[in-house]
């Protein structure tokens, strides 16, 4: 057996159980430039488009259930109350609420007056009244399509840095992955889920509990986006709180080697932070590399030339077009016209691809 010297994880058995026989076309939050993000409508859209993976995010509620949301605080740009009014910013913390309380809100229509976020993602959305789904509802939706090859790449959103405003209400990573694991096993999805996180402690806990579940190590070094967007912190004296106790300096600042040390199956960096050398090194360690979040054709082609195994995009229809032009094998779409979340695969092409400072992926 081969062990990680840092974590005593048997990395010879922590291989990706997910079997990707096609390019991993990932619809970010279900495809937030075309359907309301992290809703059953966007997830159904991704399936019917022919995405390999539904990329999505999850939070743990006060009553111990997992719901699908990127932000731990309800996003005022997309959330309306029972009276149809957009909520106040920073008012509702999902981690301090029950599922019943959350189901009173609607997240299907973006506020057209919210500014840049609407310009980037809202203008091209088809909108629907939509509630925040639970992880179980996502699993049930996937099962309703009958396609046993659909993958869910699901992110835990933790803030392990004590200086972060969101730190104090973090769930316990061990408890979170236990609940996640129970749901995945309940729906027999072990070979069709990936757990991804910037908080590598979550990934460590997942591998300890169930090494059959694939994990993906996210990272970013974008100080202009804010302190929480610096996960590696290569040049600081203290170890980064994002890496689960690992010191990146022990790996010469190399996140590929560091991710391999915790038994990660996939590495997922921000797309401007990788090179052909990173791709080749990941492959030499039997790891896949799937950058995020890529929304224009030029960058997609650049990454494909490097040899990446997948791409996460807000514009999955555009990524599909790019891949088809290159004759890259894709997943076959599955259509379910009887699904209440079936909306077809129409899209609009009117929004810019990135914010002025390039940080649309960080919203």
Model-derived regions: residue spans:
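Phosphate-group recognition and catalysis centered on beta-loop-alpha active-site segments
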Residues: 1-363
């Amino acid at each position: 057996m081969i062990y990680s010297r840092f974590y005593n994880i048997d990395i010879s058995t922590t291989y990706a159980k997910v079997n990707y026989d096609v390019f991993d076309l990932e619809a970010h939050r279900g495809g937030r430039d075309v359907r309301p993000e992290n809703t059953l409508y966007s997830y159904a859209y991704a399936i019917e488009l022919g995405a390999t993976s539904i990329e999505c995010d999850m939070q743990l509620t006060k009553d111990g259930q997992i719901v699908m949301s990127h932000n731990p605080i309800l996003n005022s740009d997309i959330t309306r109350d029972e009276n149809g009014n957009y909520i106040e910013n920073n008012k509702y913390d999902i981690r301090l609420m029950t599922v019943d309380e959350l189901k009173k809100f609607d997240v299907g229509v973006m506020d057209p007056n919210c500014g840049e976020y609407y310009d980037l993602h809202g203008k091209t959305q088809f909108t629907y009244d939509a509630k925040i789904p639970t992880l179980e509802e996502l699993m049930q939706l996937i099962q309703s399509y009958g396609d046993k090859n659909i993958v869910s790449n699901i992110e835990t959103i933790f803030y392990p840095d004590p200086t972060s405003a969101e730190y104090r209400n973090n769930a316990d990573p061990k408890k979170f992955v236990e609940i996640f694991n129970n749901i995945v096993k309940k729906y027999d999805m072990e070979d069709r889920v990936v757990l991804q996180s910037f908080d590598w402690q979550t990934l460590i806990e997942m591998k300890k509990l169930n090494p059959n579940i694939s994990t993906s190590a996210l990272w970013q070094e974008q100080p202009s986006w804010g302190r929480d967007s610096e996960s590696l912190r290569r040049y600081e004296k203290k170890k980064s709180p994002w890496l689960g106790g690992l010191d990146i300096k022990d790996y010469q600042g190399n996140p590929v080697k560091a991710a391999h040390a915790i038994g990660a199956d996939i590495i997922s960096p921000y797309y401007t932070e990788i090179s052909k050398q990173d791709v080749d090194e990941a492959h030499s360690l039997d790891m896949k590399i799937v950058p995020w979040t890529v929304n224009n054709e030029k960058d997609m082609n650049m990454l494909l030339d490097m040899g990446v195994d997948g791409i996460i995009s807000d514009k999955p229809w555009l990524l599909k077009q790019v891949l088809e032009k290159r004759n890259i094998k894709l997943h076959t779409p599955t259509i379910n016209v009887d699904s209440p979340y079936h909306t077809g695969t129409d899209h609009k092409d009117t929004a810019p691809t990135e914010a002025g400072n390039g940080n649309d992926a960080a919203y």
